[in-house]
């Protein structure tokens, strides 16, 4: 697509429209930015006008004055400029599509492999685990809701913090990476509600639970199918086997389609269970980590130029070492890696088309069930991208959970279950409470202090107060105290309830209520 000397209207400067407008203006286009939600500060709009030559408006402009309209998939189709554009049969591009076109024109990306991860759940954990796995062999830059990070040899360093996961933020992530002097082998982007069509590997973690977007005129699952429908020819798609809508949409004659299955997902149909290429299983006892020699370096996607392609397994670092032993129970030609004992007693086994590729022992300190999708999706992606199984094992066995994603820790001597993140929703809060109740029973704890709510209604559609009210009515009695976070939560009523402005204040109040044998459960929707 020719992106030169066109008249663009970029709608929604709140959710990633600003970097899109800047990129289009820098390419020699005449750009107008529409602050649809009227949330952008006047000084920011003035800077866009004076420094970048972008005309800004807080009200709709006539669609007839533009060659192309750029709008996010979540924008209400009844917005005047979109209504006019459809009536005039004017082309409307999504933020995802225009970002894809901009990225295609960036020659700096030509030698870098790109992975995009989208879905309802497990995006951040899948992307983060994959970055860890790949970094054992390659240099990786990871962009998620946790920040922009460079990964090398299983360790990360922060490049930049404060970006959202809107498609427009990818443009900023790329610039910040190159400005910092990094030239990675892989970019991994967590992206909300779809894909840009430029990924070498696209990962769809889940499509459920589905929800309405664009003023409830469309489903988020349909928008996420952009990852599938716009996938570039020759790329690979890794899709949750339960996402049948996505499997039907995939152009299998143009892209390679692989599926993965979490066996604990009760939403899978019998048909879906049969077609999965990659499956995660639990192992009742600690077992040897076997890596069949023919699976040590799968072909998958072509590796970045200049990287070694040795198929010989290296000794594992961390909790696993190369034993070099044989066992009659293992398939011929296998190399056995013996797992060191771990106190968790929880093992997983990773299968490809019915054949075991690897198994690993998990560390304690986090809710393993919250990461099942991430374990199987990241492992499948890593195998497809040419990662050695022992690197995958090392990453899994060293994994301690992600902050805000069912990680267990202590705060002032009190047990804390941290479930506060941008993807937290009321269903996640229910599951977290179930887990906390089990932990209370198993560890003979006393009460549960629940911190629940939102830091801002702008965080991924926020947490609807009416759903929180229903949650309190149903589960509030199970908690010793409930601390509701956010201005909108003041409308929620119930027994043993107090209120806090933000997560920090909520946790501070929880510490005041909690005794040494209590559990604090933090489930607040926020950027972290």
From Swiss-Prot:
GO terms for molecular function: acid-amino acid ligase activity; ATP binding. Gene3D superfamilies: Mur-like, catalytic domain (3.40.1190.10). Disulfide bonds: none annotated. Residues 306-329 have a biased composition (Low complexity). Transmembrane segments: none annotated. ATP binds at residues 119-125. Pfam families: Mur_ligase_M. Residues 331-345 have a biased composition (Polar residues). Its EC number is 6.4.1.9. It catalyses: 15,17(3)-seco-F430-17(3)-acid + ATP = coenzyme F430 + ADP + phosphate. Keywords: ATP-binding, Ligase, Methanogenesis, Nucleotide-binding. Residues 300-348 are annotated as: Disordered. One of its GO terms (biological process) is methanogenesis. Involved in the biosynthesis of the unique nickel-containing tetrapyrrole coenzyme F430, the prosthetic group of methyl-coenzyme M reductase (MCR), which plays a key role in methanogenesis and anaerobic methane oxidation. Catalyzes the activation the g-propionate side chain of 15,17(3)-seco-F430-17(3)-acid (seco-F430) for intramolecular C-C bond formation to yield the carbocyclic F ring of coenzyme F430. Belongs to the MurCDEF family. NCBIfam families: F430_CfbE. This is Coenzyme F(430) synthetase. It comes from Methanosarcina barkeri (strain Fusaro / DSM 804). The gene is cfbE.
